[in-house]
Amino acid sequence: MTQLIEQKAPAVCHAMRVFEEDYRAVGKDDLARMLALLYLIREFETTLLDLKDENLIHGPVHTSIGQEAVAAGVATALRKTDMVGSTHRAHGHFLSKALMYYAPEGFQPLRDPITPKMQEAINKTLAEIMGLKDGWCGGRGGSMHLYDGESGNLGSNAIVGGGIPLATGVAWAQKLQRKDNVVVSFFGDGAVNQGCFHEVANMAALWGVPIIYFIENNFYAVGTNVNEASFVQDLALRTLSYGINSVIVDGMDPVAVYLATRDACTRMRANPFPFVIEAKTYRHYHHAGRLAGSAFGYRTKEEEAQWLEKDPITAFPKKLMSLGLLSEAEDERLKAMAKDALAKALAFCTDVKDGKRYIPAEKWPAPESVLRHVRCEDDVFAGIQFKEREDFTTFRPMTYGEAIAAATLRNMERDERVIVLGEEVANLRGGPYGATKGIKEAFPERLFNTPISETGFSGIAGGAASAGLRPVVEIMFPDFALMASDQLFNQIGKLRHMYGGRISFPLVVRTRIAIGYGYGGQHSMDPAAYFALFSGWRILAPSNAFDYIGLFNTAVRFNDPVVILEHGLLYAEKDQVPADTMDYYIQYGKAKVLREGKDVTVLTYLTGVAKCLEAAKQLEAEGISAEVIDLRTLDYTGMDYETIGASVKKTGSVLIVEQSPRSLSLSGRLADEIQSRFFDYLDCPVGKVTAPDVPLPVSKVLEEFCIPSVARIKEAMAIGGRHQF
């Protein structure tokens, strides 16, 4: 007979009740700080709506009017060195954290005026939302993308759930760097249904990450009620299976939020581990703008009226007065302080003519400034002499696969900020393909196996990179990068630019192309053209062990995200590397002419190099001289057009050889760029050799048909050599 034994969840969820004595225990100083923040946030966001109505704000304005108790309570409970990450509805979180950071020690709003530094924070926040040059990000981030790393504002994020992995990575970095700072990641009820949240919550529990996942449950994801989106209504229950304890609080009461946050931080500093706080709160207006939700029919006026009675802007001061913790005069002082601060911010950002506000021309950013900060503009290679094979005299043998492991290990020896993470990297005697061999023995504390959670570990690596580490991430097959697309491209690839160049993501992603192994259409992607769509990424493709070491060293030194493309068929290929050093750098953006010729320029990379060299050798007997160039750098910004151009001017003909299907290849855009730059030197259009436009099949015969062969490349070279494309 079967027996069913109840299994208890590995964590617990509590609901918090707050009593009058809790208010008194908090003390008048912190209560006044919370109330001051409430008034400032409300005045700030009311001003935003006025400016939007006056057409002085471009883009959406998502206010948190009604939800201010959350931001005020959390910010008051945190230390200056703690950090917060937020959402598209971030004005309150951002402003509260910035003001508490820039306030002098012991600041008491019932006694002290807002300081110039605090006023500057308000001014810069308003300027950013208005798209002005004096904003935190130079105006390019706006309402949904606010960033100020100094004050612990990790950045607000317009992708629902998109900031959670990054915040988790920052918190993980605090632990690895032996700091006791806590990170709070704010997100709404809608984000609880995003897979990225569940991936990183599980990893945060596995790794003991000091982060508070703060769910602002305002019951509506735009107009979708939480009971339409989640079977479980108390969202804090959903992380119990990950072993994460949680508490549910009244999100309209700043004291409840403060106490829950303070207690979680205290436990976390003593024993780093994630925690979930769910605040039941309410936004009085629709998703964006000034209209109420009832105007759109997804909730009733009666419901809105019930929640309006709980509005913290009126309920909280009333409660404090009833307990003798606030006088009417003190209340009026805090209200006046908020109004005065916003009046000054408006005067900073606008002027008035004929009774109408306008933005003076000098407040706008220079249009051409938008071209800056896509990538790091610092000279990180100052004093470095780049090397090529010809610069060395003594060598030793090494395979491509050995070079990957050796270069990684050497960089970990040189820089304690370098960590390695990915699936199986600490297993199987050096990872699934030997690329991390020796690292577990040398640096077990900096080598991290991950779950099969590409979104999670990619985003966590991005957050850790922004916090000062230099992660090396292995994505086992390039196709799996599609699972992590939001983190790799919307986040890591864009945020430097969106935040005005104030953040860096110095991480390396390694991935192994498996074309030719019979893995089929979901494990055989060459992702070069995909990564090249996002200009924040640098792309390197070393075709031999010597180049791998030099380019890996270069990649780790960058303050930008770099993807290194490898090919499985190269792993066993032997090469010669310097006998007495691994500390050399190959210049990013520098292609390598491997064979000189005069009739056709052949551009290729990775396994295409050997095939093109063989085809060129065979063609030589037929009187056609091909110049073969290993591109090495594949992103369009870093492409070595100087070397390409010098060759084109000599040959008058170009052939691009890739293993990708035509629609997933670099060749289309690269050919267009070459024809635009060197049109006068070309005798014919640019030729292309790629796989046909199909997912690569498993069948050996079918896959071999798809992959460009030496014979097919030779045939195309011959046409190009005769300038007949």
Language model features: what each stretch is:
Residues 46-49, 54-207, 225-231, 236, ...:
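Cofactor-binding active-site loop characterized by glycine-rich and histidine/acidic residues
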Residues 52-57, 108-109, 142-157, 181-186, ...:
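Glycine/charged-rich beta-loop-alpha catalytic/anionic-binding loops adjacent to active sites
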Residues 126-128, 205-215, 449, 493-511:
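A glycine-rich helix N-cap at a beta->alpha junction
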Residues 64, 72-80, 96-106, 431-442, ...:
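Glycine-rich loop at the start of a catalytic domain that most often binds anionic cofactors/ligands
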Residues 1-70, 287, 291-443, 452, ...:
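Conserved acidic/glycine
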Residues 152-343, 532-652, 656-657:
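Glycine-rich ThDP/TPP pyrophosphate-binding loop and its adjacent helix/strand module
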Residues 46, 131-148, 235, 427-442, ...:
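Acidic-glycine-rich active-site phosphate/pyrophosphate-binding loop
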Residues 59-67, 88-89, 146-164, 188, ...:
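Active-site nucleophile and cofactor-binding loops and adjacent substrate-binding regions
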